[in-house]
Curated annotation (Swiss-Prot):
Entry keywords, A to Z: Behavior, Cell membrane, Disulfide bond, G-protein coupled receptor, Glycoprotein, Lipoprotein, Membrane, Palmitate, Receptor, Transducer, Transmembrane, Transmembrane helix
Cross-referenced Gene3D superfamilies: Rhodopsin 7-helix transmembrane proteins
Mode of membrane association: Multi-pass membrane protein
Protein name listed in UniProt: Kappa-type opioid receptor
Annotated GO MF terms: dynorphin receptor activity; G protein-coupled opioid receptor activity; neuropeptide binding; receptor serine/threonine kinase binding
Primary gene name: Oprk1
Protein source organism: Rattus norvegicus (Rat)
Length: 380
């Protein structure tokens, strides 16, 4: 998919939003509406499509959405990372994976201002180096996020279905090692994005695009190959693993009443499993539309109507919105995160509440608070 500054040749359109450059064909999320010529080059001068008339309000709306994603996502994910580092009780295996997910989401939210500028200016004005960095962050986010969610699901499966093995496998240290391996694995794609990414002047429309640069004579081949690889390795296989893990967990949860030795541990186990399931489900809901859209476009089955293009932009925005949703989910679904968030945001209020609770506990903790002296109970 070309990363055209214009979705259709002949009329200005949104440029390749580099942080949307998650799927290749010069690795833009924007589909290659311009057809390739016989040599594989994209958008030849003799093959032009009628432009779709996109409302000027669409870039403004997208910019507003990305602004919210930027603020909520960056602040929220930074807060998640802070409380995991700050509070010892939060350094569990599951939370180590959550830290990794928050790091990837926080990084990708930093690209939102650049995306917004590209939508509004219809060109990439930030230079070649920043273009490479932004594209690389996109790829890192895409692969580290889905790989981390997959490992979180495997971690939950082991905790629920193999509690004895979980004692050795589910440790914070091993979770950290797995996170490092995830980033190293994602680097095979992220570093490639740095090498291939760059700016290109589109003289026919007088704009600059930021995208992966493939040889023109092999463009169509690389386009299809990269799209299929991304779809299979960054979506289909991880989602299938997640589905298998949660299917086995559901069967296990239905077959036994008590998973661990105590009801409190069992309740915590089910609560954390539910949290991970919701986070995974929201991720899949947010990213499935754009993956399907890209796959359909790669097969040449999309029309070039205004409605289709508008839907495409909505799918892109929905995918990036996921980066700001996870901190909200933690705050509502996990009591430990909720308590730590409140402790950070309202330290004085929380300190006063703890002092009040401690005073109440001290007054009722010992029923023998009266000492019998001379046949009479007197306060000590």
């Amino acid at each position: 998919m070309e990363s055209p500054i214009q979705i259709f040749r002949g009329e200005p359109g949104p440029t390749c939003a580099p942080s949307a450059c998650l799927l290749p064909n010069s690795s833009s999320w924007f589909p290659n509406w311009a057809e390739s010529d016989s040599n594989g080059s994209v958008g030849s001068e003799d093959q032009q499509l009628e432009p779709a008339h996109i409302s000027p309000a669409i870039p403004v709306i997208i910019t507003a959405v990305y602004s919210v994603v930027f603020v909520v996502g960056l602040v929220g994910n930074s807060l998640v990372m802070f409380v995991i580092i700050r509070y010892t009780k939060m350094k569990t295996a599951t939370n180590i994976y959550i830290f990794n997910l928050a790091l990837a989401d926080a990084l990708v939210t930093t690209t939102m201002p650049f995306q917004s500028a590209v939508y509004l200016m219809n060109s990439w004005p930030f230079g070649d180096v920043l273009c490479k960095i932004v594209i690389s962050i996109d790829y890192y986010n895409m692969f580290t996020s889905i790989f981390t969610l997959t490992m979180m699901s495997v971690d939950r499966y082991i905790a629920v279905c193999h509690p004895v093995k979980a004692l050795d496998f589910r440790t914070p240290l091993k979770a950290k090692i797995i996170n490092i391996c995830i980033w190293l694995l994602a680097s095979s794609v992220g570093i490639s994005a740095i090498v291939l990414g760059g700016t290109k002047v589109r003289e026919d429309v007088d704009v600059i695009e930021c995208s992966l640069q493939f040889p023109d004579d092999e463009y169509s081949w690389w386009d299809l190959f990269m799209k299929i690889c991304v779809f299979v390795f960054a979506f289909v296989i991880p989602v299938l693993i997640i589905i298998v893990c949660y299917t086995l967990m559901i069967l296990r949860l239905k077959s036994v009443r008590l998973l661990s030795g105590s009801r409190e541990k069992d309740r915590n186990l089910r609560r954390i499993t539910k949290l991970v399931l919701v986070v995974v489900a929201v991720f899949i809901i947010c990213w499935t539309p754009i993956h399907i859209f890209i796959l359909v476009e790669a097969l040449g089955s999309t029309s070039h109507s205004t409605a289709v293009l508008s839907s495409y932009y909505f799918c892109i925005a929905l995918g990036y919105t996921n980066s700001s949703l996870n901190p909200v989910l933690y705050a509502f679904l996990d009591e430990n995160f909720k308590r730590c968030f409140r402790d950070f945001c309202f330290p004085i209020k929380m300190r006063m509440e703890r002092q009040s609770t401690n005073r109440v506990r001290n007054t009722v903790q010992d029923p023998a608070s009266m000492r019998d002296v001379g046949g009479m109970n007197k306060p000590v």
